[in-house]
Amino acid sequence: MGRLQRTLSNISEEEIDNGRIGIVAGAIEYPNQPALVGRAALRTGSDHVRALVADPIYEIVAGQDPNLLVDRYAGEQFEESAVERTREMSEWADALVIGPGLVDADPQAVCEAIDTIDVPMVVDALALEPSLDADLSNAVLTPSGAEVGPIRDEYGSLEAFSEETGAVITLTGDVDEIVADGERLENETGTSAMTVAGTGDTMVGIVASLLGQGMDRREAAELGAWILGKTGELATANHGPGVVATDVIERIPDTIR
């Protein structure tokens, strides 16, 4: 892990060198996910973070954090009309996130959007199952235990899935599992309080930031899991079992400095 931490310490201080992150996330039912992901990316060192959200939640997301840039697409759900906006964002970004809180998205539109993205990406939550029909050779997938079923059903194991698709997978749990190129790594940092809502979004933001700063996908997944766990340990030491995701996010700089 020291090798990966040294990679972080070598990041240039020049503006934009620390990466621009695009986020396609959120819905009327889950308007807070874009801000959680974005704040985690910013605290991990990204220079600029831009969220692309459905029109009905634009005002909510835009008012949550003045550090977050926010664009919108028409309609209440992610549909065909949002694919072109996603492609445009990917041309601006150094890394992209798709999926957190993306309720009722059109699966075909999600798959098509992923296929238009040329930069490294993190595929999460409600974009995971539609992504299985897309090109994932530039992706890190971050399923929870409940979301990994379709992958195992289709491929038998995470190792087989990673070998066949080229994807990297981070499966969080009591012991996190990172699978890349058919190999499995483990991360044991973290506490039992890390099951609180929003820590998955925090992980996504951290990993996306590392990708945007130039790390390869395997390194970003491995270090991202470690950073989340260590940051959670610091936050839990302060707040006890009442720790929430924003407590964790605010301790990210203490972990990576």
Swiss-Prot record:
Q: Spell out the InterPro entries in the cross-references.
A: CARKD (IPR000631), Ribokinase-like (IPR029056)
Q: Which residues bind (6S)-NADPHX?
A: D201
What are the recorded Gene Ontology BP terms?
Answer: metabolite repair; nicotinamide nucleotide metabolic process
What chemistry does it catalyse, as a reaction equation? (6S)-NADHX + ADP = AMP + phosphate + NADH + H(+); (6S)-NADPHX + ADP = AMP + phosphate + NADPH + H(+)
Cofactors needed by this protein, per the record, are:
Mg(2+)
Where does the source fall among the domains of life? Archaea
Gene3D superfamilies in UniProt: 3.40.1190.20
Q: Which GO terms describe its molecular function?
A: ADP-dependent NAD(P)H-hydrate dehydratase activity; ATP binding
**Per UniProt, which keywords does this protein have?**
ATP-binding, Lyase, NAD, NADP, Nucleotide-binding
- Residues given in the record as AMP binding sites: G200
Question: Its Enzyme Commission number?
Answer: 4.2.1.136
Cross-referenced Pfam families? Carb_kinase
Q: Is Chloroplast set as a keyword in this record?
A: no
> Tell me, what does this protein do in biology?
Catalyzes the dehydration of the S-form of NAD(P)HX at the expense of ADP, which is converted to AMP. Together with NAD(P)HX epimerase, which catalyzes the epimerization of the S- and R-forms, the enzyme allows the repair of both epimers of NAD(P)HX, a damaged form of NAD(P)H that is a result of enzymatic or heat-dependent hydration.
Member of which family?
Belongs to the NnrD/CARKD family.
The family database entries (PANTHER family) matched by this protein are listed as:
ATP-DEPENDENT (S)-NAD(P)H-HYDRATE DEHYDRATASE (PTHR12592:SF0), ATP-DEPENDENT (S)-NAD(P)H-HYDRATE DEHYDRATASE FAMILY MEMBER (PTHR12592)
Q: How does it assemble?
A: Homotetramer.
Q: What is this protein called?
A: ADP-dependent (S)-NAD(P)H-hydrate dehydratase
UniProt organism field = Haloterrigena turkmenica (strain ATCC 51198 / DSM 5511 / JCM 9101 / NCIMB 13204 / VKM B-1734 / 4k)
- What lineage, starting at the top, does this entry show? Archaea, Methanobacteriati, Methanobacteriota, Stenosarchaea group, Halobacteria
